[in-house]
């Protein structure tokens, strides 16, 4: 069984990596990009029967810094 966890900085939290990507895209001639938010995708191979609640607990304890990041789970 697989699960994907999408982690992004919360709205209002500065994203210096995203800003660096936006700037680099502009330098490459992609002038239409007004903003970039960078995040991460974590793919988990889970034992059958692992619940979404267990994956949520993983996120809360380790995979996401819930003070500044939000996350979304796909199973």
Language model features: what each stretch is:
Residues 2-43, 47-50, 54-75:
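Long, contiguous binding/interaction regions
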